[in-house]
A protein has these predicted regions:
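Conserved class I S-adenosyl-L-methionine
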Residues: 127-152
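A short glycine-rich, Lys/Arg-flanked "PGG" loop and its adjoining helix->strand segment in the class I
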Residues: 112-127
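Hydrophobic beta-strand segment of the Class I
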Residues: 99-100
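C-terminal lobe and adjacent flexible extensions of AdoMet/dcAdoMet transferase-like proteins
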Residues: 195-240
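Class I SAM-dependent methyltransferase SAM/SAH-binding core
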Residues: 26, 31-89
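Short alpha-helix
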Residues: 148-172, 176
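Conserved catalytic loop of SAM-dependent methyltransferase domains
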Residues: 170-196, 205-206
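Class I SAM-dependent methyltransferase Rossmann-like catalytic core
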Residues: 1-34
Protein backbone atom coordinates (compact mmCIF):
# COMPACT_ATOMS: atom_id res chain seq x y z
CA UNK A 1 0.00 0.00 0.00
CA UNK A 2 1.53 3.29 -1.11
CA UNK A 3 1.24 6.61 0.72
CA UNK A 4 0.11 9.63 -1.28
CA UNK A 5 2.73 12.31 -1.81
CA UNK A 6 0.51 14.91 -0.09
CA UNK A 7 0.37 12.78 3.06
CA UNK A 8 4.16 12.40 2.97
CA UNK A 9 4.61 16.14 2.64
CA UNK A 10 2.19 16.76 5.51
CA UNK A 11 4.00 14.30 7.78
CA UNK A 12 7.35 15.98 7.26
CA UNK A 13 5.82 19.39 7.95
CA UNK A 14 4.70 18.25 11.43
CA UNK A 15 6.92 18.16 14.52
CA UNK A 16 7.14 14.36 14.57
CA UNK A 17 8.23 14.34 10.92
CA UNK A 18 10.78 17.09 11.53
CA UNK A 19 12.31 15.07 14.38
CA UNK A 20 12.30 11.83 12.35
CA UNK A 21 14.03 13.58 9.47
CA UNK A 22 16.67 15.02 11.79
CA UNK A 23 17.45 11.63 13.33
CA UNK A 24 17.59 9.81 9.99
CA UNK A 25 19.73 12.59 8.53
CA UNK A 26 22.25 12.04 11.33
CA UNK A 27 22.58 8.42 10.27
CA UNK A 28 22.86 9.26 6.58
CA UNK A 29 25.49 11.91 7.27
CA UNK A 30 27.51 9.46 9.36
CA UNK A 31 27.90 7.23 6.28
CA UNK A 32 28.05 9.98 3.66
CA UNK A 33 29.80 13.00 5.23
CA UNK A 34 29.64 14.82 1.91
CA UNK A 35 28.81 14.27 -1.75
CA UNK A 36 31.41 16.54 -3.31
CA UNK A 37 31.40 15.99 -7.07
CA UNK A 38 29.03 13.01 -6.80
CA UNK A 39 25.88 12.30 -8.80
CA UNK A 40 23.15 11.68 -6.20
CA UNK A 41 19.72 10.16 -6.84
CA UNK A 42 16.83 9.82 -4.39
CA UNK A 43 13.97 7.37 -5.02
CA UNK A 44 10.61 7.23 -3.22
CA UNK A 45 10.05 10.41 -1.22
CA UNK A 46 13.65 11.52 -0.66
CA UNK A 47 13.33 15.30 -0.81
CA UNK A 48 13.40 15.90 2.98
CA UNK A 49 16.86 14.28 2.96
CA UNK A 50 18.44 15.35 -0.33
CA UNK A 51 19.11 18.81 1.06
CA UNK A 52 22.16 17.23 2.73
CA UNK A 53 23.80 16.88 -0.67
CA UNK A 54 22.19 19.32 -3.09
CA UNK A 55 24.78 22.08 -2.69
CA UNK A 56 27.87 19.83 -2.89
CA UNK A 57 26.79 17.19 -5.39
CA UNK A 58 27.57 17.47 -9.08
CA UNK A 59 23.92 16.61 -9.68
CA UNK A 60 21.05 15.77 -7.33
CA UNK A 61 17.75 14.32 -8.57
CA UNK A 62 14.56 12.94 -6.99
CA UNK A 63 12.49 10.25 -8.73
CA UNK A 64 9.05 9.51 -7.29
CA UNK A 65 6.92 6.48 -8.28
CA UNK A 66 3.75 7.10 -10.27
CA UNK A 67 1.53 5.37 -7.70
CA UNK A 68 2.68 7.86 -5.04
CA UNK A 69 2.72 11.09 -7.02
CA UNK A 70 5.29 13.87 -7.27
CA UNK A 71 5.74 17.37 -5.88
CA UNK A 72 7.96 20.10 -7.25
CA UNK A 73 11.40 20.13 -5.66
CA UNK A 74 13.13 22.33 -4.85
CA UNK A 75 10.24 24.74 -4.51
CA UNK A 76 12.04 27.98 -5.45
CA UNK A 77 14.44 26.66 -8.10
CA UNK A 78 14.23 24.76 -11.39
CA UNK A 79 12.67 21.38 -10.65
CA UNK A 80 14.90 18.38 -9.95
CA UNK A 81 12.04 15.92 -9.28
CA UNK A 82 10.21 13.66 -11.74
CA UNK A 83 7.39 11.10 -11.77
CA UNK A 84 8.62 7.68 -12.96
CA UNK A 85 7.87 4.00 -13.39
CA UNK A 86 10.11 2.49 -10.71
CA UNK A 87 10.69 -0.59 -12.89
CA UNK A 88 12.03 1.51 -15.78
CA UNK A 89 14.05 4.40 -14.40
CA UNK A 90 14.72 7.03 -17.10
CA UNK A 91 18.50 6.87 -16.66
CA UNK A 92 21.31 5.08 -18.53
CA UNK A 93 23.39 2.32 -16.96
CA UNK A 94 25.86 3.40 -14.25
CA UNK A 95 24.51 6.96 -14.32
CA UNK A 96 24.78 7.86 -10.62
CA UNK A 97 27.28 7.46 -7.79
CA UNK A 98 24.93 7.41 -4.81
CA UNK A 99 21.30 6.42 -4.38
CA UNK A 100 19.02 7.05 -1.41
CA UNK A 101 15.88 4.90 -1.11
CA UNK A 102 13.29 6.09 1.41
CA UNK A 103 9.54 5.36 1.45
CA UNK A 104 10.35 3.22 -1.58
CA UNK A 105 11.25 -0.42 -0.98
CA UNK A 106 8.44 -1.18 1.46
CA UNK A 107 5.89 0.55 -0.81
CA UNK A 108 6.94 -1.23 -4.02
CA UNK A 109 4.73 -3.91 -5.60
CA UNK A 110 7.92 -5.62 -6.79
CA UNK A 111 10.92 -4.68 -4.62
CA UNK A 112 13.13 -7.09 -6.53
CA UNK A 113 12.52 -5.28 -9.81
CA UNK A 114 13.10 -1.94 -8.10
CA UNK A 115 16.46 -3.02 -6.67
CA UNK A 116 17.59 -4.45 -10.02
CA UNK A 117 16.87 -1.08 -11.60
CA UNK A 118 18.77 0.61 -8.78
CA UNK A 119 21.70 -1.72 -9.44
CA UNK A 120 21.57 -0.94 -13.16
CA UNK A 121 21.74 2.84 -12.80
CA UNK A 122 24.28 2.77 -9.95
CA UNK A 123 27.91 3.09 -11.01
CA UNK A 124 30.37 0.31 -10.14
CA UNK A 125 31.62 1.04 -6.62
CA UNK A 126 28.63 3.37 -6.21
CA UNK A 127 26.74 3.49 -2.92
CA UNK A 128 23.12 3.09 -1.92
CA UNK A 129 21.37 3.86 1.35
CA UNK A 130 17.93 2.34 1.88
CA UNK A 131 15.75 3.42 4.80
CA UNK A 132 13.36 0.56 5.56
CA UNK A 133 10.77 0.01 8.34
CA UNK A 134 11.73 -2.78 10.74
CA UNK A 135 8.94 -5.34 10.97
CA UNK A 136 9.45 -5.62 14.73
CA UNK A 137 9.67 -1.90 15.35
CA UNK A 138 7.38 0.51 17.11
CA UNK A 139 7.10 2.72 14.06
CA UNK A 140 5.37 0.05 11.95
CA UNK A 141 2.66 -0.48 14.59
CA UNK A 142 0.91 2.82 14.02
CA UNK A 143 -0.42 4.47 10.90
CA UNK A 144 0.22 8.03 12.08
CA UNK A 145 3.56 8.00 10.21
CA UNK A 146 4.48 6.80 6.68
CA UNK A 147 6.67 4.11 8.25
CA UNK A 148 3.49 2.28 9.29
CA UNK A 149 2.47 1.62 5.68
CA UNK A 150 3.68 -0.91 3.14
CA UNK A 151 5.66 -4.04 3.87
CA UNK A 152 8.19 -3.86 6.73
CA UNK A 153 11.27 -6.10 6.69
CA UNK A 154 13.37 -8.08 9.11
CA UNK A 155 17.14 -8.09 8.83
CA UNK A 156 17.14 -11.59 7.33
CA UNK A 157 14.51 -10.63 4.75
CA UNK A 158 16.50 -7.60 3.63
CA UNK A 159 19.65 -9.70 3.47
CA UNK A 160 17.95 -12.24 1.22
CA UNK A 161 16.41 -9.54 -0.99
CA UNK A 162 19.76 -7.80 -1.44
CA UNK A 163 21.52 -11.02 -2.37
CA UNK A 164 18.81 -11.88 -4.89
CA UNK A 165 19.32 -8.50 -6.56
CA UNK A 166 23.15 -8.65 -6.74
CA UNK A 167 23.93 -6.72 -3.57
CA UNK A 168 25.95 -8.28 -0.75
CA UNK A 169 25.13 -7.26 2.87
CA UNK A 170 28.08 -5.51 4.54
CA UNK A 171 26.84 -3.54 7.55
CA UNK A 172 24.01 -1.72 9.28
CA UNK A 173 23.23 1.29 11.46
CA UNK A 174 20.38 2.08 13.83
CA UNK A 175 17.95 5.01 14.04
CA UNK A 176 14.52 6.06 15.35
CA UNK A 177 14.60 4.66 18.87
CA UNK A 178 12.07 7.15 20.18
CA UNK A 179 8.40 6.11 20.12
CA UNK A 180 6.36 7.63 17.25
CA UNK A 181 4.23 9.88 19.42
CA UNK A 182 3.60 13.62 19.15
CA UNK A 183 3.97 14.49 22.83
CA UNK A 184 6.24 17.47 23.34
CA UNK A 185 8.50 15.89 25.96
CA UNK A 186 9.14 12.84 23.75
CA UNK A 187 10.03 15.01 20.77
CA UNK A 188 12.29 17.22 22.87
CA UNK A 189 14.15 14.18 24.22
CA UNK A 190 14.53 12.41 20.85
CA UNK A 191 18.32 12.78 20.77
CA UNK A 192 18.54 11.35 24.29
CA UNK A 193 16.55 8.30 23.16
CA UNK A 194 19.01 7.75 20.30
CA UNK A 195 22.08 8.14 22.50
CA UNK A 196 20.77 5.99 25.35
CA UNK A 197 19.59 3.21 23.05
CA UNK A 198 22.93 2.91 21.22
CA UNK A 199 24.87 2.75 24.49
CA UNK A 200 22.59 0.41 26.47
CA UNK A 201 20.72 -2.88 26.29
CA UNK A 202 18.08 -1.25 24.09
CA UNK A 203 20.56 -1.53 21.23
CA UNK A 204 19.13 -4.92 20.29
CA UNK A 205 15.57 -4.00 21.11
CA UNK A 206 15.17 -0.88 19.01
CA UNK A 207 17.14 -0.45 15.88
CA UNK A 208 17.15 0.68 12.30
CA UNK A 209 19.60 -0.12 9.53
CA UNK A 210 21.57 1.31 6.60
CA UNK A 211 22.20 -0.39 3.19
CA UNK A 212 25.25 0.43 0.45
CA UNK A 213 26.76 -1.65 -5.34
CA UNK A 214 28.00 -0.62 -2.07
CA UNK A 215 24.51 -0.49 -0.50
CA UNK A 216 23.63 0.86 2.96
CA UNK A 217 20.16 0.38 4.52
CA UNK A 218 18.53 1.21 7.82
CA UNK A 219 15.31 0.01 9.42
CA UNK A 220 13.24 2.00 11.86
CA UNK A 221 13.90 0.91 15.43
CA UNK A 222 12.38 -2.36 16.62
CA UNK A 223 10.91 -3.76 19.79
CA UNK A 224 13.05 -6.39 21.56
CA UNK A 225 15.01 -7.49 19.63
CA UNK A 226 15.15 -5.55 16.45
CA UNK A 227 17.65 -5.41 13.63
CA UNK A 228 19.18 -3.42 10.80
CA UNK A 229 21.01 -4.22 7.67
CA UNK A 230 23.89 -3.42 5.30
CA UNK A 231 24.55 -4.80 1.86
CA UNK A 232 27.06 -4.77 -0.99
CA UNK A 233 27.34 -6.05 -4.55
CA UNK A 234 30.51 -7.70 -5.67
CA UNK A 235 31.45 -4.36 -7.18
CA UNK A 236 28.63 -2.23 -5.82
CA UNK A 237 28.06 -2.35 -2.14
CA UNK A 238 24.99 -1.85 -0.03
CA UNK A 239 24.68 -0.91 3.62
CA UNK A 240 21.47 -1.42 5.58
Amino acid sequence: MSVDVIDLRNFYSQRLGVVARRLINRGIRAHWPDAQGQRVLGIGYPTPYLGLFREDAERCLALMPAVQGVLKWPTARPTLAALVDERELPLPDSAVDRILLIHALEMSDDPGDLLREVWRVLAPSGRMIAVIPNRRGLWVRTDNTPFGFGRPYSRSQVTQLLRETWFTPVGWTEALYMPPVKRGWVLRSAVVWEFASTTSGFRDACRSSFLSRFAIAFLSAPLPARSSISGAHSDRAGVW
